[in-house]
UniProtKB/Swiss-Prot annotation:
HAMAP family tied to this protein: DNA_gyrase_inhibitor_YacG (MF_00649)
Superkingdom as given in the UniProt entry: Bacteria
Organism: Brucella abortus (strain 2308)
Cofactor binding remark: Binds 1 zinc ion.
GO BP field: regulation of DNA-templated transcription
Sorted UniProt keywords: Metal-binding, Zinc
Entry cofactors: Zn(2+)
Gene transcribed to yield this protein: yacG
Subunit: Interacts with GyrB.
Family: Belongs to the DNA gyrase inhibitor YacG family.
Stated name of the protein: DNA gyrase inhibitor YacG
Lineage: Bacteria, Pseudomonadati, Pseudomonadota, Alphaproteobacteria, Hyphomicrobiales
Annotated function: Inhibits all the catalytic activities of DNA gyrase by preventing its interaction with DNA. Acts by binding directly to the C-terminal domain of GyrB, which probably disrupts DNA binding by the gyrase.
Length: 57
């Protein structure tokens, strides 16, 4: 049986990803990534909270 999608490297360690932890290779790498999001290491750029557009008035 052919795999549903091509194997990609784990974004944390570079090992081949597994179906159970996709796109990661293991629950450990999955948890490392989650911790980085929760601790603020990863952020999505945007306007600071409370800043209003000048065109909204």
């Amino acid at each position: 049986m052919a795999p549903l999608r091509p194997t990609r490297p784990c974004p944390e360690c570079g090992k081949p990803s597994t179906r159970e932890a996709y796109p990661f290779c293991s629950p450990r790498c999955k948890n490392i990534d989650l911790n980085r999001w929760l601790s603020g290491s990863y952020v999505i750029a945007g306007k600071p909270l409370g800043e209003e557009d000048e065109n909204d008035s």
